Design a protein with these regions (language model features):
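Lipid interaction determinants
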Residues: 1-50, 54-105
Length: 105
């Protein structure tokens, strides 16, 4: 288990879209810039908000939605999203460059 640090997160997050497997359903998070993010949940709910990198994770504040603190945990062959309680909430199934899901639109 390796929690990814700020420098690594900046490389794999800014300007990309993470496709996250949430138990057989996919969520999409597009990190448009170093401060703006957009999310589409499996049930169709969309959020737009502000995020900031931390030394060992990031924080996000969704407009009209939740605020959260997250870490990305790397193990060989996988990167998991871990919430503030230490619970794994999803696994990255792929990372796309840009915004192919048009979440920022």
């Amino acid at each position: 288990m390796t929690i990814l640090n700020k420098d690594t997160l900046a490389i794999i997050m800014i300007g990309t879209t993470h496709v996250i497997d949430m138990g057989g359903k996919s969520a999409f998070i597009h990190y448009e810039t170093g401060t703006r993010a957009h999310m589409l949940l499996p049930d169709g709910t969309r959020f737009h908000g502000l995020w900031t990198l931390q030394d060992d994770g990031y924080k996000v504040e969704w407009q009209d939605g939740p605020t959260g603190a997250w870490k990305l945990d790397h193990t060989p062959g996988a990167i998991d999203y871990v919430d503030a309680t230490g619970t794994v909430r999803g696994r990255i199934s792929r990372i796309d460059f840009g915004d192919p899901e048009r979440l920022a639109a």
